């Protein structure tokens, strides 16, 4: 689900879905502690697997501006959310942004990994997988190699920060 407005009633949106059987992905067009806490409460109550896909760096790269928050600091907000939400995954990296901007496969991997590196630097508590949204082109075997390389290199970067997280690649 893509949600652009904080006023969306997420409980009503999810009430008739079999949340214990499906994985839910939200792409939020804003950064709100209260909204994400509601999603976390739903995930806990219904034993759901939910990914919020928050990507402030991707927002900056795409729009030229950070998410608007009350304190005007996206990383402080993400740090607070990461330390208080235990039932959902928060962080996402939009690698498709770089492919659509004309990057080749090596550049896409490099930019996505530098993106992840910055999140590891700025967010103190990352305990859930990071979602990588990756665009694929028509060169089938090279795209498979790109995904394998991304997974392998991400594990190397995560190991440097003493994380044993795997990247999550929804394909």
Where are these regions (language model features)?
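Catalytic alpha/beta active-site cores
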Residues: 1-135, 170
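Short glycine/threonine-rich loop-to-helix capping motif typified by GTGT followed
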Residues: 104-109, 138-149
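Charged, flexible cofactor/metal-binding loops and thiol motifs
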Residues: 143-158, 171
């Amino acid at each position: 689900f893509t949600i652009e407005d904080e006023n969306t009633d997420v409980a009503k949106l999810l009430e008739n879905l079999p949340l214990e059987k499906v994985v839910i992905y939200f792409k939020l067009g804003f950064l709100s502690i209260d909204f994400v806490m509601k999603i976390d409460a739903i995930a806990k109550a219904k034993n759901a697997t939910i990914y919020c896909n928050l990507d402030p760096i991707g927002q900056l790269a795409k729009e030229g501006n950070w998410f608007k928050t009350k304190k005007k600091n996206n990383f402080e907000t993400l740090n607070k959310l990461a330390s208080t939400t235990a039932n959902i995954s928060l962080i996402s990296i939009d690698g498709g942004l770089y492919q659509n901007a004309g990057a080749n496969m090596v550049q896409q991997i490099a930019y996505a990994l530098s993106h992840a590196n910055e999140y590891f630097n700025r967010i103190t508590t990352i305990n859930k997988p990071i979602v990588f949204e990756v665009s694929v082109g028509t060169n089938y075997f090279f795209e498979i190699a790109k995904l394998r390389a991304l997974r392998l290199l991400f594990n190397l970067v995560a190991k440097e920060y003493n994380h044993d997280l795997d990247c999550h690649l929804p394909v």
